[in-house]
Each structure stands twice: as structure tokens, then as C-alpha cells.
Amino acid sequence: MIDGDGFRPNVGIVICNRDGQVLWAKRYGQHSWQFPQGGVDDGETPEQAMYRELYEEIGLKPEDVTIMATSRNWLKYRLPKRLVRWDSSPVCIGQKQKWFLLQLDPGRESRIQFGCHGHPEFDDWRWVSFWYPVRQVVSFKREVYRRVMTEFAPLAMPVPVVQVNRKDGRRNRSR
């Protein structure tokens, strides 16, 4: 399903842990890494598509995660001309994405597996610092990643703990 402007509706998934790290997945047989993502099928809501893609690509089920946020807007990126399939109809020139921030529930990391539905999209994964993907993703997705991570940062980043040790309740200051 491609809209009138040539963009395919898609969902993007940022999975974080309690330390503010995000799941970064390596595309099958390639050297490129990205967040899980996938198309929205006809008749499907973005949330339904997210859960389907989450299971198909990462092997996680709704009970393994908690939705922390959804992007306010659909975010678009254009494909480089060399990746556009000009012989298809309609022509898809890019993706418009609704993003989801999920927190992996405690003790569920062992459930991550690839290829739960056909050919796997990914063959490796790791936890990376929150902002790492913005610098590392393929260049044509970089602006979308910057925007979504900026929107999700207040919810995903752990709040620093300030230790109070003094009897008067003020913070210790080290010089």
C-alpha cells in the first residue's frame, strides 16, 4: 500500500532497556544496522503492524514489552534514486513511519530471536547507547532517526540519581 505521494506506510520500533540503551539490529547478511521496521498492511492499525513486525523480526510478543510512546507525527524519508524500483506500480519513493518506543520488560531479553516468520531480517543484535544509532544508520534515514530519538529521549533516558549525604540535605560537591 503506497500513498498518493509515493510513500509506503511503515512502523519503526525503538526497544530500550532500563539503562537507556537501545536494541540495534544487524541486517541479515549485510554490514548495515538499524532499528526494526516494517510495512503497515491494508486494514491494519500502526499498533497492530508494530506488534506483528516485533514478532516477525525480533521474536518478541506484546507481553514482553511496554509501549512507552508513539511518535506524534508520521516521519518520512526518501529512498536514494538507485534504490527506487521505477518499474513497479505504483512507484515507492520512500517510507512514512509511525514510531514506537518500547521498553523490554525485565527478564525478557532471552526471548529475542530472529526469523520467527520466514526469512530473518536480522542476524545479530546488541545494546547500544541511546544516541549511537543516529550517527550509525544509513545516511538517508539519519534525519528521521535524529527526530524520533529527540522526541523519545525524555522518556527513554534514565534519570540521573543525585546522592544526598549531608545532614542538611544539600548535595555534596566535589572540586
Curated annotation (Swiss-Prot):
<dbReference type="GO" id="GO:0006402">
    <property type="term" value="P:mRNA catabolic process"/>
</dbReference>
<protein>
    <recommendedName>
        <fullName>RNA pyrophosphohydrolase</fullName>
        <ecNumber>3.6.1.-</ecNumber>
    </recommendedName>
</protein>
<dbReference type="InterPro" id="IPR015797">
    <property type="entry name" value="NUDIX_hydrolase-like_dom_sf"/>
</dbReference>
<feature type="domain" description="Nudix hydrolase">
    <location>
        <begin position="6"/>
        <end position="150"/>
    </location>
</feature>
<dbReference type="GO" id="GO:0034353">
    <property type="term" value="F:mRNA 5'-diphosphatase activity"/>
</dbReference>
<dbReference type="Pfam" id="PF00293">
    <property type="entry name" value="NUDIX"/>
</dbReference>
<dbReference type="InterPro" id="IPR020084">
    <property type="entry name" value="NUDIX_hydrolase_CS"/>
</dbReference>
<feature type="short sequence motif" description="Nudix box">
    <location>
        <begin position="38"/>
        <end position="59"/>
    </location>
</feature>
<dbReference type="InterPro" id="IPR022927">
    <property type="entry name" value="RppH"/>
</dbReference>
<comment type="function">
    <text>Accelerates the degradation of transcripts by removing pyrophosphate from the 5'-end of triphosphorylated RNA, leading to a more labile monophosphorylated state that can stimulate subsequent ribonuclease cleavage.</text>
</comment>
<dbReference type="GO" id="GO:0005737">
    <property type="term" value="C:cytoplasm"/>
</dbReference>
<keyword id="KW-0378">Hydrolase</keyword>
<dbReference type="InterPro" id="IPR020476">
    <property type="entry name" value="Nudix_hydrolase"/>
</dbReference>
<dbReference type="InterPro" id="IPR000086">
    <property type="entry name" value="NUDIX_hydrolase_dom"/>
</dbReference>
<comment type="similarity">
    <text>Belongs to the Nudix hydrolase family. RppH subfamily.</text>
</comment>
